[in-house]
């Protein structure tokens, strides 16, 4: 009787195991990903958009959960627009634009820090340059004044001394990046992906030789051609 009980228990246990094994062996159902267009439609961020008489596009998103405003200016200029011999200009101006303007001389960050701004920075890229800060709502007028002054009146503050200083900063940035472990791999990737005359064929930071050769007139001409309100988008949230 004892052996019979053990045998029956074993059969019962195997009976329990069989469905589990069958389930484990069944192929998992394939879930087809949703089309990207459908996913984009689900991102519903309300905003208003208008264009000022000077050509500046303005996009405003209102969310009053916190008394702050994110201010972001996107310039439609990046390294892909740089001609041969002028590489690194977009990145150079990302630095120059934080060095003061005609009606707001000195460090761009200082007056914003005084009103409690956070997230202050700028980023150059292949296709665009972006400057941004987040300020308390009462300081929005101050932030817009500073942005408008460096958009329209930057060049009066760009002297040969300022150019030389910021040129040196950018070149030092490049040296630091190049001398990190694997720092040169980006150049190998660009060489492998694009031809030398392709807009993406050179790095955003540019070459030391091109930066050395840049004159004050070259730099000012670059700004006049690319940093006007009709080539920018102001985003407020």
Residue spans for each PLM region:
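Charge-rich, well-structured scaffold segments of protease-associated domains
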Residues: 2, 15, 25-29, 46, ...
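Bacterial N-terminal signal peptides
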Residues: 9-19
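Sec/Tat signal peptide C-region and signal peptidase I cleavage site
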Residues: 20-24
């Amino acid at each position: 009787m004892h052996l019979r009980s053990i045998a029956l228990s074993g059969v019962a246990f195997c009976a329990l195991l069989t469905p589990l094994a069958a389930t484990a062996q069944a192929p998992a159902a394939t879930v087809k990903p949703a089309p990207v267009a459908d996913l984009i439609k689900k991102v519903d961020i309300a905003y208003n958009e208008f264009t000022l008489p000077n050509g500046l596009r303005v996009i405003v998103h209102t969310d009053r959960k916190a008394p702050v405003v994110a201010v972001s200016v996107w310039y439609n200029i990046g390294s892909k627009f740089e001609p041969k011999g002028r590489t690194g200009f977009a990145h150079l101006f990302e630095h120059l634009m934080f060095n003061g303007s005609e009606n707001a001389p000195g460090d761009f960050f200082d007056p914003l820090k005084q009103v409690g701004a956070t997230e202050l920075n700028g980023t150059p890229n292949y296709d665009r340059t972006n400057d941004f800060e987040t300020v308390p709502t009462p300081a929005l007028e101050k932030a817009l004044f500073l942005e408008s002054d460096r958009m329209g009146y930057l060049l009066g503050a760009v002297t040969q001394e300022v150019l030389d200083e910021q040129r040196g900063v950018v070149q030092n940035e490049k040296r630091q990046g190049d001398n990190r472990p694997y720092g040169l791999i980006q150049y190998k990737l660009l060489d492998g992906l694009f031809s030398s005359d392709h807009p993406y064929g050179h790095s955003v930071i540019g070459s030391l030789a091109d930066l050395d050769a840049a004159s004050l007139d070259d730099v000012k001409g670059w700004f006049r051609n690319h940093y006007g309100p009709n080539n920018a988008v102001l985003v407020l949230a």
